[in-house]
Each structure stands twice: as C-alpha cells, then as structure tokens.
Amino acid sequence: MKKRITFIVFLCAIVAASLFFVQSCVRKSQHVAGFQNYQATIDGKEITGVTKNISSLTWSAQSNTLFSTINKPATIVEMTTEGDLIRTIPLDFVKDLETIEYIGDNKFVISDERDYAIYVISLNADSEVSILKKIKIPLQETPTNCGFEGLAYSSQDHTFWFFKEKNPIEVYKVTGLLRSDELHISKDKTLQRQFTLDDVSGAEFNPQKNTLLVLSHESRALQEVTVRGDVIGEMSLTKGKYGLSHNIKQAEGIAMDDSGNIYIVGEPNLFYRFTSTKSR
C-alpha cells in the first residue's frame, strides 16, 4: 500500500512538472510571436561623431528624428532615423544624463541619474535649452549608479514611468508633471513585481497597443509588457536572432516611431533599427 501511494505521488509530480514545462513553452512561444515579423534593417551602425557613452533614445513626431543622450559629458544628440548625426547640444546643469523622452512641441523630459533629478526642458532649432520644471524623486540618500535608466511616456493620459535600473528594479509612476499642480508620484508595484529581466536599461510606451517596451542589456532582451506587467512579447538581442549579425552587447535606449519601427542604441556608439514586415 505504501509503495502504491509513493508511486501515485511520484506520478502526480511528473504530471505537474510536464504541465509546467508545456505551459512555459507556450508562454515562450507566445512571447516570441509578439516580435516575429521584425528584422534588423540597420545592424550595429556606428554613429559618426559620437565616440562613447550613448544612452537612451526617443523619437520626435514633430521632426521625425531621434534624440539620444551622452551621459558624460552631459549632451543631447539628435540624429536621423538612419542613425546619422544631426547635432549635439551640451548641457551644463546635469551631472549624469541618462534618459530623454519627447513630449511634444519641442519639449522633452530628461533625468539626472546622479541626483535623481527630473527636468522638463524646451529645445529649439538653434539648440537653445530652457528649463521649464525640475523635481526630485528621492530613491535613496546616497546617489549611486543605479538610478533612472528607463523612461516611458503616454501622451494619451500624460503618464510617465521612470524605471530604476536594478538592485532592485523599481518603477515610479508620475502624473501631473506637465501641470503646475497635482503632481503625483507612486511606486508601480503591480508592474515591477512582474519583471523577469536582470535590469532595465531603457523603456518606451507603445500607444498603438497601450503597452510598454522594456529593454535590458544584461538579459539581452526587449520585452513588451502590458501596464499591469504581463509579458506579451520578447525579442532576443543575440547573434542570429531577428537578423542580428552580433549580440547587442550593451543596449541602452529604445524608441518606436508611428510606423512601428523599433530603434535601439548601444554603447559605445552603435545604432540599430528593426522593421516589421507588416503593421503591428
């Protein structure tokens, strides 16, 4: 009798393990399917005029150009969607520039990883920068190199998501930043507890699907997640996947344009573009 019970328990364990394996495979298959139509059409192009420290990326619908940052010395970089440099704009009020997000009408939100400061700025065609607003999100008393690395913005409801890189990954949801009052900052614990990535190095909001694109250079992956944190797509950033000839070693910024093209920048100065064979 005892042997029979042991056998039944053993059999149940095998069935449970098999079900878990099948479900895991199904989830992975579904995740891959989210990006299955994408291929690299620009594969690790060096950005001429930038030598190192490229970090973060955003697309401007106003100019149909991309804006990136160099963290040290703090500099905003504008380039074409082909990865060609247009101009550089030095900033003298930021210590460690890490994120940039276009919010419309020549305005951007940037963050300083060194002191957790967030700026709303305007940038005109003459490369003149004006600070419109500054706030701080106190992550911890002693600044580290694990501050904000990802920033996503929904123009639909003017919500920002600021992603702390790691140790641990944290997500701060900010509303009211673009108004003169009603500023609200909260930890998005529902979103952050779902992450399986080793770190967050960049982020982007996809208004077409109301989802977030979250980049990880340590995991060498790009995930698409719902605002509740459910993973619905994953792209491997390794050699042989999605037309890549080499691993993207240190992916630092992610942007998407209104045609669904995905742009990634990686240190020291590399540019990637992924294009879908059909609209998403």
Curated annotation (Swiss-Prot):
Q: Which domain of life is it from?
A: Bacteria
For the keyword Transmembrane helix, the answer is yes
Q: What is its main location?
A: membrane
The UniProt transmembrane annotation reads: 5-25
Extract the PROSITE patterns matched here. Answer: PROKAR_LIPOPROTEIN
Which InterPro entries would you find in this protein's record? Answer: 6-blade_b-propeller_TolB-like (IPR011042), YjiK/CarP (IPR009722)
Annotated keywords: Cell membrane, Membrane, Transmembrane, Transmembrane helix
- Quote the Gene3D superfamilies the UniProt record gives: TolB, C-terminal domain
- Asked whether the keyword Transmembrane is assigned, the reply is yes
A single Gene Ontology CC annotation of this entry is: plasma membrane
Q: What is this protein called?
A: Uncharacterized protein YjiK
Organism of provenance: Escherichia coli O157:H7
